[in-house]
């Protein structure tokens, strides 16, 4: 019998309307544009997602301001992040791709790549729908793994193949895991992360620079400001509450931090009335 529990690990749909919803938290979104286009903001930047483009989003909550054309058609496969980890080939290339997709989730595919990618999507769907197959979960895992390998190949073709040493990959993975867990809310010094990873701050910065092209400080501040931006949009906390939530030494320092990285004061975003609560 098929493993019925697998149905909560993969969701296949023709819409991106729920990509930023709580329902999809913990899922990776893989979307292939069949026709039309969509405009959206991600990670604080504006992107276009058009015909024959592939989009891979690790954190759907960072997607905002979606504007979808009337002729937009898309095939979407949401996969539980833990299941993706089980399916991902033992290759350090995944780290390079993960960092690149965090900065730009859209990959432009040529005709041959699009045809192959569409075949991969249909392959996953076929295995997902074949409930009576004895090796149901294993077959889906293989289909997803093949799709991921093609993603790696697309990325290497478009952006160049550069390998990362196993040691660098392990440390970078642990560093990003700490940021994913929200450590930046209480710790924004490189020395803290370096100490937790049992390396020097200089070595951690060197690893970040070589694997991602950005410093450790960049990633710490990037995660911090994206989280702050999300709370500012929701307007669920006051100015002082947000300063405390992110463990800033004072509201004044919090204000300067937001001004520096967002180009606006938090009081303007939250509103004067909110600040006086």
Give residue ranges: language-model regions.
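Short hydrophobic/aromatic patch on the recognition helix
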Residues: 52, 204, 253-254, 258
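A hydrophobic/aromatic-rich effector-binding and dimerization subdomain
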Residues: 68-129
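Terminal helix-turn-helix DNA-binding modules in bacterial transcription factors
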Residues: 210-249, 271-277
């Amino acid at each position: 019998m098929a493993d019925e529990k697998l149905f909560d690990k993969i969701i296949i749909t023709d819409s991106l309307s729920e990509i930023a919803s709580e329902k999809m938290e913990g899922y990776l979104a893989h979307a292939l544009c069949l026709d039309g286009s969509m405009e959206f903001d991600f990670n604080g930047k504006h992107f276009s997602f058009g015909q024959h483009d592939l989009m891979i989003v690790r954190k759907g909550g960072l997607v905002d301001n979606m504007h979808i054309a009337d002729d937009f058609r898309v095939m979407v496969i949401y996969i539980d992040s833990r299941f993706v980890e089980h399916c991902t080939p033992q290759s350090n290339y995944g780290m390079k791709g993960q960092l690149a997709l965090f900065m730009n989730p859209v990959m432009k595919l040529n005709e041959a790549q699009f045809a192959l990618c569409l075949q991969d999507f249909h392959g996953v769907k076929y295995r997902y729908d074949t409930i009576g197959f004895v090796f149901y979960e294993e077959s889906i895992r293989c289909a997803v793994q093949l799709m991921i390998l093609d993603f790696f190949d697309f990325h290497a073709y478009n952006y160049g193949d550069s390998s990362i040493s196993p040691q660098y990959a392990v440390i970078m993975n642990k560093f990003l895991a700490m940021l994913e867990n929200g450590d930046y809310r209480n710790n924004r010094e490189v020395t803290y992360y370096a100490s937790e990873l049992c390396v020097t701050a200089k070595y951690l910065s060197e690893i970040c620079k070589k694997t991602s092209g950005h410093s450790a400080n960049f990633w710490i501040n990037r995660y911090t400001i994206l989280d702050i931006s999300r709370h500012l949009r929701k307007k669920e906390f006051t100015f002082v509450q947000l300063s405390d939530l992110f463990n800033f030494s004072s509201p004044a320092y919090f204000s300067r931090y937001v001004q520096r990285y967002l180009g606006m004061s938090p009081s303007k975003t939250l509103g004067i009335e909110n600040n006086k609560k």
